[in-house]
Amino acid sequence: MRLIPLSTAQQVGKWSANYIVEKINAFAPSADRPFVLGLPTGGTPLATYKALIELHRAGKVSFQHVVTFNMDEYVGIPADHPQSYRTFMYENFFNHIDIKDENINLLNGNATDPQAECARYEAKIKSYGKINLFMGGVGNDGHIAFNEPASSLASRTRMKTLTEDTRLANSRFFDNDINKVPKYALTVGVGTLLDAEELMILATGINKAQAVQVATEGAVNHLWTISCVQLHPKAILVCDDPATMELRVKTLRYFQQIEAQERQQYQD
């Protein structure tokens, strides 16, 4: 696992955006061979989306031959609801880049048969072979997407019951009223994430520090979904300074030294 310790959330956004652009451009996607990108919602990736939009406007990257799959969607709220993840993605990213609408893949939280919708989504992912890079965030309790604590590390896309902690955390988007937060969501599984060629998790803020510590220094544990990054051959954890506060000094210095050497080698 690679851990990128940075100072601020803004730096996390810029670093992760530049990494995505590097990967897309190195892949040199085409209509017949698109780059497949997994995407999250929430507050953490907003800085990344902002930086990606700026890089696109500067002519540094095109999304014409990029196919996206989003991590999750609430069940039971209209697609055009202000807090649907479809609305979030279009307002904060898709409307500002040159991605083709047919290349955007989002879970349908209003499907009459949620199980069939999840199977369709998995099949669509597999039709592209694999996701080249899946970016995600992490919750205070270590969840990734809506893979809540005790999710199977082999799980696939499915419907999940949201914990009270998750609904309480998300109530800030629903007038601070937990009763307005949906109780269910469709989400890619942990196994779906682990199938990606690369997995990049963003963690910012002191409230993510315990999750970062468990992911980096703890054992693989289904009660902490974030620990699954230890099972991935190409996982990256990009953190700001507050998110590393629970790490041992020796651990943090190790990763700082590794990244300093990487930068020096790149400059040489």
UniProtKB/Swiss-Prot annotation:
Q: Does the keyword Hydrolase apply?
A: yes
Cited Gene3D superfamilies: 3.40.50.1360
Site positions per UniProt: Part of the allosteric site: 151, 158, 160-161, 254
Question: Entry's InterPro entries?
Answer: Glc/Gal-6P_isomerase, Glucosamine6P_isomerase, Glucosamine6P_isomerase_CS, NagB/RpiA_transferase-like
Q: What is its EC number?
A: 3.5.99.6
What residues sit in the active site? 72, 141, 143, 148
Pathway it acts in? Amino-sugar metabolism; N-acetylneuraminate degradation; D-fructose 6-phosphate from N-acetylneuraminate: step 5/5
Q: Which domain of life is it from?
A: Bacteria
Top-level enzyme category: hydrolase
GO BP term, pick one:
carbohydrate metabolic process
Disulphide bridges: none
UniProt note on regulation of activity: Allosterically activated by N-acetylglucosamine 6-phosphate (GlcNAc6P).
Question: Per UniProt, which keywords does this protein have?
Answer: Allosteric enzyme, Carbohydrate metabolism, Hydrolase
Q: Which Pfam families match?
A: Glucosamine_iso
Which molecular function GO terms apply here? glucosamine-6-phosphate deaminase activity; identical protein binding
Q: Which reaction does it catalyse?
A: alpha-D-glucosamine 6-phosphate + H2O = beta-D-fructose 6-phosphate + NH4(+)
Record has Hydrolase as a keyword:
yes
| Cross-referenced HAMAP family | GlcN6P_deamin
| Subunit relationships | Homohexamer.
Q: NCBIfam families under this entry?
A: nagB (TIGR00502)
Indicate the family of this protein.
Answer: Belongs to the glucosamine/galactosamine-6-phosphate isomerase family. NagB subfamily.
Q: What does this protein do?
A: Catalyzes the reversible isomerization-deamination of glucosamine 6-phosphate (GlcN6P) to form fructose 6-phosphate (Fru6P) and ammonium ion.
Please state what the protein is called.
Glucosamine-6-phosphate deaminase
Species of provenance: Proteus mirabilis (strain HI4320)
What would be the name of the gene that encodes this protein? nagB
